């Protein structure tokens, strides 16, 4: 699964993603519920692309029909939409006060708030369905010809949402959780996982910097339909105390929920890998 696709999906959720019915209303109106539903598709596509790449480069063999069905079942189980929503809901409920929730809901009930939520939901779908080369190309093109005013607004948005840091934490957590899960299922030492994790941590600043640099282009692409005046009002909300607290709470909730799902996926996928390896050894012995 590519870092670019995860970055786009995670950032779309954080842009506007918290007790009982009010939290449910918040997640529904913000589009967060709809965006979380895309994660299962995102993971399945990423894993299948990774396997296809391994086969093409002769580093591995393709999955059988039975193994592919098992993979889909594991992804569906680990990244179950209702479970992810439940974890995010619980986390937001602990972090946001009723006053925080009321303030965000008031924003979401404005014409601009509804417009932003619709854009975010649509963009989350695009990050899953659009071929990556096409998506990267469109994001790159979106950066061209922007006015200084537009660039300044997009930089403020990226800074307020801490895009680089939030996405880097999520990506590092996902990769580490999956690797740990796979290795624990294969009864292997976690020393290799720790080594890889340290390598990712060492590159964290560079990864975050690269993502911050790309924030202008990515948000230019995502919010290209917004006029400068509307974009500025959106940025002003995100930069407000309520907006900052909400985006931080959403990023943390998503990171936690996705990490748990990734760890579970890694363990189950490891079991499939172990069975596959044993099957191959059995056939070789004949």
Where do the protein language model's features map onto the residues?
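N-terminal Sec/ER secretory leader and immediately downstream segment
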Residues: 20-128, 265, 286
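An acidic-aromatic pocket/loop used at catalytic or ligand-binding sites
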Residues: 20, 24-37, 42, 133-174, ...
């Amino acid at each position: 699964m590519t870092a670019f696709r995860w970055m786009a999906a995670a950032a779309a959720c954080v842009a506007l993603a918290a007790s009982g019915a009010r939290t449910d209303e918040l997640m529904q109106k913000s589009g967060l519920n709809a965006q979380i539903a895309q994660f299962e598709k995102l993971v399945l596509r990423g894993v299948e692309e990774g396997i296809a790449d391994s086969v093409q480069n002769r580093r591995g063999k393709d999955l059988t029909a039975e193994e592919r069905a098992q993979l889909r079942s594991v992804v569906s189980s680990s990244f179950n939409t209702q479970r992810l929503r439940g974890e995010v809901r619980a986390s937001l409920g602990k972090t946001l006060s009723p006053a925080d929730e009321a303030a965000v809901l008031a924003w979401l009930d404005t014409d601009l708030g509804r417009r932003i939520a619709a854009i975010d939901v649509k963009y989350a779908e695009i990050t899953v369905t659009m071929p990556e080369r096409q998506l990267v190309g469109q994001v790159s093109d979106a950066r061209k010809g922007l006015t200084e005013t537009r660039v300044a607004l997009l930089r403020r948005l990226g800074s307020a949402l801490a895009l680089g840091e939030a996405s880097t934490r999520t990506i590092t957590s996902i990769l580490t959780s999956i690797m740990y899960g796979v290795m624990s299922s294969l009864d292997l030492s976690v020393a290799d996982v720790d080594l890889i994790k340290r390598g990712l941590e060492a590159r964290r600043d560079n990864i975050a910097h690269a993502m911050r640099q790309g924030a202008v282009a990515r948000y230019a692409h995502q919010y290209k339909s917004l006029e400068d005046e509307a974009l500025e009002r959106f940025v002003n909300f995100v930069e407000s105390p309520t907006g900052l607290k909400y985006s931080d709470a959403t990023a943390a909730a998503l990171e936690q929920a996705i990490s748990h799902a990734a760890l579970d996926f890694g363990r189950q996928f490891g079991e499939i890998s172990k069975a596959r390896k044993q099957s191959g050894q059995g056939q070789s012995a004949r």
